[in-house]
């Protein structure tokens, strides 16, 4: 599990390390702008039941990301089976599908520079005992099988998951009119 100090140091290294330098600083004015990405974020049934949806939205908005799609649904088993297809041979798969279909899920699509990697850092380790304080799972998760939230793990995975959970007509392209407090360029 590691000490609290070790987990905080690990999170700091993740956010401040060379690979994730863009999490904290803007690119130089002479460099190319960050590409806009989209990612799927889903508040799982335990997060909805515990009324954490607003907290999750607030964290992503404060980070400067733009919400371009959102819906609450009782996830159909067909979507869950496709979403978790890589886990079908795992012994916990039936329990995972049962849990994910046990209550409503709030699925969201967030847009922003480097949103896939940053959102993964924001949500924290899958195992709540390893999730650093300050991450969503570190602050709210109580068990590895009830870990509040899902976020896509790659740009390709995000595209696949977004197409699975949303119709293109459910995603909005809207301009924020420059009225944002993001540290990212408009």
From Swiss-Prot:
Keywords, in A-Z order: ATP-binding, Kinase, Lipid-binding, Magnesium, Membrane, Metal-binding, Mitochondrion, Nucleotide metabolism, Nucleotide-binding, Transferase, Transit peptide
GO CC, one annotated term: mitochondrial matrix
One Gene Ontology term from the biological process aspect of the record: GTP biosynthetic process
Active site: 150 (pros-phosphohistidine intermediate)
Residues annotated to bind ATP: 44, 92, 120, 126, 137, 147
Topology in membrane: Peripheral membrane protein
Enzyme class: transferase
HAMAP family membership: NDP_kinase
Described function: Major role in the synthesis of nucleoside triphosphates other than ATP. The ATP gamma phosphate is transferred to the NDP beta phosphate via a ping-pong mechanism, using a phosphorylated active-site intermediate. Through the catalyzed exchange of gamma-phosphate between di- and triphosphonucleosides participates in regulation of intracellular nucleotide homeostasis. Binds to anionic phospholipids, predominantly to cardiolipin; the binding inhibits its phosphotransfer activity.
Protein name (database record): Nucleoside diphosphate kinase, mitochondrial
